[in-house]
Amino acid sequence: MTSPSGRLAGKVAMVTGASSGIGKACIERFSAENATVIAVDIAKPVTEGLMGQLSSYACDVTNSDSIKEVINNISSEYGGLHIVVNSAGVSARNALSDTTDIERIWDRVIEVNLKGTFLTSMHSVPEIEKSGGGAIINLASTMGIVGYPTGLRNGYSAYPPSKGGVVQFTKTLAVDLADRGIRVNCLCPGFVETSLTESLTSDNETNNYLKGLHPMGRLGRPDEIANAALFLASDESSFITGSSLVIDGGYTAQ
C-alpha cells in the first residue's frame, strides 16, 4: 500500500458495503489518510483492530429511513460529512438464496446496486453541502460500459445494466451538483478478487479465463480500487467530476 500522507485529514467519510472487498479496502485506506471513517453495511461492519478513527452502522441502502438515520447520526456525532463511497452491491450469485427466481433476482440487483446508490447519494447531498462540499464516489464496473455475455435466463443479465445505470447516474448527478461544490465520479473496475467473484475464481478453469480477459494477466485487488477512490476523494482530483475511472488491467483497451 502507498505510504499514508494525511490527504484526508479533517474529512468525514462514509463508505457503504464496508464489511468486505472494495468497501473494506476503502475504509482502511481512508483511515490511513487520517479521515474520520464511518463504515456502513447491511450488518454492522466489524472495525475492531483497524487503525484510525472509525465507527460503524448497520444500514439498508435500499431503505430511505435507514439511510437518513445513519446520516443524522453522523451529523450529530461528527458535525458534517464530506465524502461518500457507494460501494454496497450484489451480484446474481448472492442477491437471493433462491437462484431460480430470475425476475426477483433482477429486481434485487437493480434495487441494491442502482437504487441504493441513488438513495444514499440523495440523502447525503444536503449534509455534504452544509459541510462545505466534498465528493461522492460510486462503484460501477467495466460491465457497465461494455457488453458482456451473461445469459438472459440465468439472472446475471441484471448486473451490467445496474452498473451502467450507476455510470449514467454519476454523470447526471455530477452536472446537477457541480455548482454546489460536490464532485461526483465513479470507478469501473474489471474483475477484482472479492466475495462477488469468489465463487467464480474458486474454479481453476474459470479463474484462468477471467485472468486471461485482462492483458495484465491477473485480477485486480481491492486495495488497488481503494487507491483510485482515495484519489477521487482527495483535493488532487479537484477539477474532476462526472468521470468514470476504469481500473481493469487493460480489459477495455482491447
What annotation goes with each model-predicted range?
Residues 68, 91-107, 148-158, 198-202:
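Conserved mid-core segment of classical short-chain dehydrogenase/reductases
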Residues 137-165, 170-171, 175-179:
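Catalytic loop of short-chain dehydrogenase/reductase
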